[in-house]
Amino acid sequence: MANNKSAKKRILITKRNNLQNRFYKSSVRTLTKRFLSDLETYKISQSNTDKDKLQNGLSSIYSLIDKGYKKNVYHKNTAARKKSKLAALLKAA
C-alpha cells in the first residue's frame, strides 16, 4: 500500500481514470454494435427512416470517440481509425 500522500492521491486518480476509460470504451463498443445492426437493417429495407437513424447513430459514436480522445482514453490515430472505418461502412451501404 502507498505510504506517502502523493502516492495515495495517484491511486485515487488511477481508479477514477480507469472508470472513465471503461465507460468511454464500453459506450463506444455498445453504440458501434447498435450501429452495425442498424446498418444490416438498412441494407435490407433501404428506407429513409433507417438512413436517418444511421446518421444519428454515427454522430453519437463520433461524439463519444472525440470526447474519449480529448480525455486521453484513445490515441489520436486510434480515434481517427475508428471513425474512418464506421464512415466507410456507412458509405458502402
Swiss-Prot record:
Question: Which residues are the signal sequence here?
Answer: none
Localization recorded for this chain is:
Plastid, Chloroplast
Some GO term, biological process aspect, for this entry: which one?
Answer: translation
GO cellular component labels:
chloroplast; small ribosomal subunit
The cross-references to InterPro entries, in alphabetical order and at most eight, read: Ribosomal_bS20, Ribosomal_bS20_sf
Q: Does the keyword Plastid apply?
A: yes
One Pfam family name from the record? Ribosomal_S20p
Q: Which GO molecular function entries does the Swiss-Prot or TrEMBL record give? A: small ribosomal subunit rRNA binding; structural constituent of ribosome
Q: Which residues cross the membrane?
A: none
Highest rank taxon of the organism: Eukaryota
UniProt entry keywords in alphabetical sequence: Chloroplast, Plastid, Ribonucleoprotein, Ribosomal protein, RNA-binding, rRNA-binding
Q: Which family does it belong to?
A: Belongs to the bacterial ribosomal protein bS20 family.
Q: What biological function has been recorded for the protein in this entry? A: Binds directly to 16S ribosomal RNA.
Q: Which NCBIfam families match?
A: S20
Name recorded for this polypeptide: Small ribosomal subunit protein bS20c
What is the organism lineage in this UniProt record?
Eukaryota, Sar, Stramenopiles, Ochrophyta, Bacillariophyta
